[in-house]
Each structure stands twice: as C-alpha cells, then as structure tokens.
Amino acid sequence: MYKRQGLDYKLVQQAYVGYVYGDSTAGQAALYGVGLSGIPIFNVNNYCSTGSSALFLARQAVQSGTIDCAIALGFEQMTPGALDILFEDRPNPLMRFYDEMTSLQGFDESVPWAAQFFGGAGNEHIKEYGTSVETLAKIRVKASKHASKNPFAIFNKEVSEEEVLGLSLIHI
C-alpha cells in the first residue's frame, strides 16, 4: 500500500517523528530500522496534534534555511476504546489539564478523559464564538472522510452529519 517515493536518504538532514504511546526514543528506533541514521532525529509528542506538529517543525526547519531536506513521519499503535495512561512509572503530563478541567467543569468517571477534554473545549468554543453544533458536526464528518481512506486508522468508519448530530453531547 505505501511505497517509498525515491528520496535518497543521504539527502535527509533532519527527521521529525511523531508518536504518543511509544517510549522516549521510538523515532530513533524506527528510523535506524530502515537505515536512516547519522542525522538529528527529533521525537515529537503533542497528543492529537502530534502529526501536524512534526510536519510543521520539519517545514519550519527547511523554510528557515537551516537545512534543505527534512522528513516528517508519524506512527501509533492504539487499541480500541478510550485512551488510557500507559506509563504509570512517571507523572502523567496531562494531570495539570485534568485538574484544571475538573475545577472548571467537573469530571464524570463514566466518560473517557479525552471526550471530556474535547467536549469541554467544544463547549467553550460555542460559548465564546457562537459556533454551532452543526459546524462541529461537519468537522467530525470531514475527519471521518479522511480517516476512512486509511485502513490502519482506529476510527476509520465514515459518518454522516445526521449520525453525528444524533449522538449525545458531552456537557458536564
């Protein structure tokens, strides 16, 4: 399905590798495994914005003139269901957000964290900017259309606006 586009690895001067659930040097492990080494490899972890962040950083490095060629890639191995704490041997960086969210909107043990984070953000966007629920539904529909083209995406079922609007809203 995926094929190499003929880029000679010798041209790559920096790599930006996005993932969330891998351990600290998963980018190096992935790139060394395909023979790409001897360059700076930056591991990027920005939760749901990880892929976009890796691409932005690679683009920024090229645009700045620091380098001529960068590679951005991402990978993740997720399991079905709600996101969970994977590394219990260290503090979870989301705890500050969790504490703040809990003080602002409360916390419902029966609803996954991510749904409450994004649901709360959606509610605040609606309040501050007057965004309609229909507009947010259209965003979900567009995301599902793109995800449906990736057989490895965890949520790869295309959904309609009517389906999205028929779901329960998270208001805490």
Mark where each language-model region is.
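Conserved catalytic cysteine-centered active-site region
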Residues: V17-I71, Q77-F117, I154-L169
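Conserved small/polar residues in nucleotide/adenosyl-binding loops
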Residues: M1-Q5, I170-I172
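Short secondary-structure capping/turn segments at boundaries of alpha-helices and beta-strands
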Residues: R4, Y16-V17
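Phosphate/pyrophosphate-binding loops at sites that engage ATP/ADP/AMP, CoA/4′-phosphopantetheine
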Residues: K3-L11, H125-G130
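Short acidic capping loops at alpha-helix termini that bridge into adjacent secondary structure
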Residues: D8-Q14, G38-P40, E134-T135
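N-terminal leader/propeptide and maturation segments of large enzyme subunits in energy/redox metabolism
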Residues: D108-S160
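A structural signal for short, well-ordered beta-strand segments and their strand-loop junctions
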Residues: I71-A72, T135
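Short acidic/histidine-centered micro-motifs embedded in hydrophobic/aromatic stretches
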Residues: G18, L73, I139-A143
